[in-house]
């Protein structure tokens, strides 16, 4: 098999294994699970018929050849008997209560209407041995969850269903097909005998869940978030959702760091928790402590009667010192292999001291802007979750400066944060302290550290291939580029640029004729992270969501899965997947938590790095996102994250730091929102001081799509892109035409005024070019891919053929030669296609004009792909028009013959079309 051969069976096997290992068993009274051979199974809940493979928004828009739901997988089981009469009752009810898809982007309901479980239904099902109750939830981009029934809370109908079924069946299993954790108080109230978080497992998700329910896979997933009794128990809830300022008053005490320190009694299920069908004993010890790391050993013994895996988790309790610390902090973890009953596996876990160090943002410990280890006794806890980890060693540490840095991204708005204080009963209470304010001027720092300008030479005949082959220095190559070339390179083009793989997010690099003449290839990126989004309808593999990946605690398995995704990217000529998502689960209501991993930064970093490494091993790369503090969807373009520098570094940036330093990430995406008054897309201290100077990052930084920036103290605008250039945010994503500057950005204006210099533009261009020279695009440009591998890439199956039967034809007007089509009744839901024929009077040049609108906001992404005789001509991605009609025109080119057909493919719901015009542009010149 060649380098780009994609073994779809192995891909599916790995995805299924991840989906299974992600399942978290919270409860299993009296060995309710696994299902037993011959079990008669009653399935309740419409979610059995409406499986959520992923959440909403760009992270979930993956077209797939198939999706295996939990019900599909159940029906494939030969050793259990499904109650088909009960399923038929649901099927008939669903016909009268169809799936509600909402109105497109950001409007899909969090859940679907549920059927009431009447007494007669229970009588129908009473002969079964076990009941499976399916609960489904979704949320996503531009759509936070809410503390309401049908979202974070169960509806009355759902609660009644669980109550009645749990009373009627000796064995009741509630399966949660959700992206985020939800309220769980109903478990204590209705007492189902088993509860399983199944997450959103991608296209193989159903198979993975059934592997666990049947016992083919022993559940080994662990919670990546603390499940508290009430949403109000999370300290971030107080400020979550504010449209203007979100104060991070809880500081570093996020998730279990807060609950284990201050509120253990408010926890239902602790971080890292998850049951197995067997029992394990973990005996851990500290092996050694050196200047660089600590080494721990854990012996894991299977004391039960079923083979399975276990996760060893290592926590630290650092001395409070002057800074204050959480009572527990995860510093390492490792998953065992399959351990047979009675057998033992020894694990060695190496933990860098940098994972243990604390950042002094005030100087109270004597070393401001340093990561330090305060003097005192450090206790090690090893176990299967944060609550049950046992003390397994301790060591004394002298005061140590681990890393000396400089202040960056500190707040400018005064507020208070929490800090532990020990009372007379040896219990930690909350004390409030003032957060240190910013003392440096980032603008002065930026101008002081400007790169030296490379003198412009004009075209000397150098091509990028000469740099690639070490014949010419990169600076000499860049010296040829005019300021207009450099500005154009700053602007990525998209969405769905015709210059790269159809339906993808953006093109960048050699996107103008001038840049192409220098031998700069056009690179491509596609939305992720749970698979490749291609809005033209091209199929890709849909993967388990980010939370599911985290719950595996299996770094090696995640890496293997994403190596397959890397091969898939290469086969589709995509140079970077826009993922992994690595923001912190600060609050359970964040709509995009499904894309992200955990409330813990170390786990987030390790799982994110595994995805990056896997993709890069295959030859493509990943874009880690969103840097940083992008922790709510409400008002995501404008809400200012007011956060201490310590919390930024220890919590919200730490995972990204691990992905850069350990995963060798080469691409980063900033956020929509400001952090401490500066929009991240234009934050020099974020994009340069921290990312490049401190972490050693040498890749590209790109904005989120249609992001804004501000000059500090002023409002943000989309036109004000000069701060992005100055900050070393290399790529603005994205515009329809880089050369024409359709958004009227101010980069050229600020260049001519002297605020943006040639050296700023050259520096950013060098970053882009260095990235491209390591990309698949460069290998294609230089014909460095073997004939065998090219055949593998170009020989993929095309399953987009159109049936010509029953196509309605529209005929050209005799006078104008135009065809006007009333499109008001077109099927326009996500995944729909409209196919129609056109019959022309004249050979010649034609355009297609489409008049359309959307009620959604300007950050909505509504792709519409245009096929002409089964060839993709263009994909239009419009943003929400807030109800205003707009007309988009695309070239069809020179058309021969009379009869042809057009297909419109809707990549998202919510786009209304008024009319389609096939516009005759003239006879033109024959193209031969």
Regions found by a protein language model. Name each.
Residues 1-388, 406-849, 863-895, 899-928:
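Glycoside hydrolase catalytic-domain context in secreted enzymes
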Residues 395-404:
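Short beta-strand edge segments in extracellular beta-sheet folds
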Residues 302, 854-856:
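Extracellular acidic, Ser/Thr/Pro-rich low-complexity tracts
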């Amino acid at each position: 098999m060649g380098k780009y051969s994609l073994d779809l069976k192995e891909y599916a096997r790995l995805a299924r294994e991840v989906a299974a290992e992600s399942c978290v068993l919270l409860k299993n009274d009296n060995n309710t699970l696994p299902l037993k051979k011959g079990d008669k199974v009653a399935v309740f809940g419409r979610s059995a018929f409406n499986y959520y493979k992923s959440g909403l928004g760009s992270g979930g828009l993956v077209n797939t050849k198939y999706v295996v739901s939990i019900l599909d997988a159940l029906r494939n089981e030969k050793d259990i008997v499904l109650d088909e009469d009960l399923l038929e009752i649901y099927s008939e009810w669903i016909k009268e209560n169809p799936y509600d898809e909402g109105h497109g982007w950001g409007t899909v309901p969090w859940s679907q209407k549920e059927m009431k479980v009447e007494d007669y239904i229970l009588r129908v099902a009473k002969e079964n041995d076990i009941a499976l109750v399916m609960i489904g939830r979704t949320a996503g981009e531009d759509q936070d969850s809410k503390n309401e029934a049908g979202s974070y809370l169960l509806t009355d109908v759902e609660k009644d269903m669980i109550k009645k079924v749990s009373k009627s069946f000796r064995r009741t299993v509630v399966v949660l097909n959700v992206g985020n954790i939800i309220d769980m108080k109903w478990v204590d109230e209705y007492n189902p005998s088993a509860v399983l978080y199944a997450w959103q497992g991608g296209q193989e998700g159903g198979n993975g869940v059934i592997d666990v329910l049947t016992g083919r896979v022993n559940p080994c997933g662990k919670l990546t978030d603390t499940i508290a009794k009430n949403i109000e128990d999370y300290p971030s809830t107080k400020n979550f959702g504010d449209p203007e300022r979100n104060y991070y008053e809880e500081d570093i005490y996020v998730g279990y760091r807060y609950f284990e320190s201050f509120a253990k009694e408010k926890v239902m299920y602790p971080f890292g928790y998850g049951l197995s069908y067997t029992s394990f004993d973990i005996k851990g010890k500290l092996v050694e402590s050196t200047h660089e790391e600590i080494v721990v050993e854990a012996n894991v013994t299977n004391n039960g009667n079923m083979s399975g895996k276990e996760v060893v988790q290592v926590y630290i309790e650092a001395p409070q010192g002057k800074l204050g610390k959480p009572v527990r902090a995860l510093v390492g973890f490792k998953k065992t292999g399959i351990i047979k009953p009675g057998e033992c596996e020894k694990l060695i876990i190496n933990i860098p001291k940098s994972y243990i160090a604390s950042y002094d943002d005030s100087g109270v410990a004597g070393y401001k802007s340093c990561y330090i280890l305060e003097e005192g006794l450090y206790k090690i806890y090893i176990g299967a979750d944060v609550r049950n980890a046992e003390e397994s060693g301790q060591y004394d540490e002298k005061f140590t400066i681990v890393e000396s840095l400089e202040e960056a991204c500190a707040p400018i708005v005064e507020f208070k944060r929490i800090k532990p204080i020990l009372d007379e009963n040896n219990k930690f209470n909350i004390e409030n302290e003032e957060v240190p304010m910013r003392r440096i001027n980032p603008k002065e720092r930026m101008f002081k550290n400007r790169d030296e300008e490379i003198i412009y030479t004009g075209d000397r005949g150098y091509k990028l291939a000469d740099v690639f082959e070490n014949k010419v220095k990169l600076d000499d190559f860049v010296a040829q580029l005019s300021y207009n070339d450099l500005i154009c390179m700053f602007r990525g083009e998209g969405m769905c640029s015709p210059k790269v793989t159809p339906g993808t997010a953006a093109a960048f690099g050699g996107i103008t004729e001038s840049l192409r003449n220098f031998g700069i290839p056009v690179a491509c990126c596609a939305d992720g992270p749970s698979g490749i989004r291609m809005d033209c309808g091209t199929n890709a593999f849909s993967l388990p969501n980010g939370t599911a990946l985290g719950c595996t605690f299996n770094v090696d398995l995640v890496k293997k899965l994403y190596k397959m995704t890397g091969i898939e990217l290469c086969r589709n000529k995509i140079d970077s997947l826009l993922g992994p998502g690595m923001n912190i689960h600060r609050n359970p209501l964040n709509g995009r938590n499904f894309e992200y991993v955990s409330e813990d930064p170390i786990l987030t970093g390790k799982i994110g790095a595994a995805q990056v490494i896997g993709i890069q091993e295959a030859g493509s790369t990943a874009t880690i996102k969103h840097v940083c503090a992008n922790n709510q969807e409400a008002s995501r373009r404008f809400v200012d994250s007011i956060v201490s520098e310590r919390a930024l570094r220890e919590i919200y940036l730490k995972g990204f730091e691990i992905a850069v330093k350990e995963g060798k990430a080469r691409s980063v995406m900033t956020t929509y929102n400001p952090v401490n008054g500066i929009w991240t897309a234009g934050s020099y201290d974020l994009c340069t001081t921290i990312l490049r100077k401190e972490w050693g990052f040498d890749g590209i930084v790109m904005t989120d799509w249609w992001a804004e920036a501000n000059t500090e103290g002023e409002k943000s605008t989309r036109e004000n892109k000069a701060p992005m250039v100055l900050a070393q945010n290399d790529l603005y994503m994205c515009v329809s035409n880089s050369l024409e500057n359709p958004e009227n950005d101010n980069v050229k204006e600020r260049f001519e005024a002297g605020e943006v210099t040639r050296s700023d533009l050259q520096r950013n261009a060098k970053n882009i070019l260095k990235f491209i020279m390591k990309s698949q695009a460069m290998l294609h440009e230089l014909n460095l891919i073997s004939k065998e591998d090219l055949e593998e890439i170009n020989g993929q199956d095309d399953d987009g053929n159109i049936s010509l039967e029953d196509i309605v034809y529209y005929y050209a007007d005799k006078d104008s030669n135009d065809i006007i089509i009333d499109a008001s009744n077109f099927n326009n839901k996500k995944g729909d296609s409209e196919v129609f024929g056109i019959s022309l009077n004249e050979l010649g040049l034609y355009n297609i004009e489409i008049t359309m609108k959307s009620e959604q906001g300007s950050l909505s992404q509504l792709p519409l792909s245009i096929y002409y005789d089964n060839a993709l001509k263009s994909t239009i991605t419009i943003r929400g028009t807030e109800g205003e009609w707009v007309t988009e025109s695309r070239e069809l080119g020179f058309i021969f013959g009379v009869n042809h057909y057009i297909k419109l493919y809707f990549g998202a719901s919510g786009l209304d079309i008024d009319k389609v015009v096939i516009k005759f542009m003239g006879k033109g010149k024959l193209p031969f």
